[in-house]
Amino acid sequence: MKIVLFGPNGMIGSCIATELSDRGHEVVGVSRSSGADITDPAQVASAVEGADVVVCAISNRGAGYTLADVARSLLDGLRRAGAQRLLVVGGAASLEVPGGGRLLDTPDFPEEWKGEAAQGAEALDVYRSVDDLDWTYVSPAAFIHPGERTGAYRLGGDQLIIDDSGNSEISAEDYAIAIADLVDSGEHLRERVGVAW
């Protein structure tokens, strides 16, 4: 399949690019450094023309736009290009924690991450309002980091996945396996899924 990947150079995006390429997919990377403006639906449409699947793994740190802006632009661009399938590297902060509420709203959630985390939750709301495209919002564990590719992960829904010790963790490499498996299977359309060990 032809996969257009926005954000192929970051920690997560580079792992996704490697995993998809290793599976024989044609991966076309689109990044800010190449001059692409993900907030311009016309540029998005041009970039995703002919794609079987679009994956968005961008970070908006210091970019001057919100993740909800990106969501609206991506969706508009996909519609213009006639592309149907979108997977989004989401955030964990909007996941529900044991006892109720979102991870973002817990007392221990780091203050310096709240702005970006709230943007991720707003973007998820944008995706959830869409019923004409096949999107999947993939929330990682609370802690995602470079590490070992074990091939093991668990999929969940709107609840934060924790292990028997109360930890929520995944390597970027295993998260990329989950993304690639979702690309290959075509499952979990118009849903948010969580991924953790």
Give short role names for the model-derived ranges:
Residues 3-23:
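N-terminal Rossmann NAD(P)H-binding glycine-rich loop of SDR-like oxidoreductase domains
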Residues 12-16, 74, 179:
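Hydrophobic residues within alpha-helices
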Residues 26-32:
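Conserved glycine-rich Rossmann-like NAD(P)H-binding loop of the short-chain dehydrogenase/reductase
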Residues 33, 73-116, 125-129:
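Conserved Rossmann-fold NAD(P)-dependent oxidoreductase catalytic core, especially the SDR/UDP-sugar
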Residues 34-81, 184-187:
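NAD(P)H-binding glycine-rich loop region in Rossmannoid oxidoreductase-like domains
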Residues 119, 168-180, 191:
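Substrate-positioning beta->alpha
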Residues 125-146:
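Conserved beta-loop-beta element that borders a ligand/cofactor-binding pocket
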Residues 130-131, 145-153, 182-191:
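Glycine/proline-rich active-site loop of Rossmann-fold NAD(P)-dependent oxidoreductases
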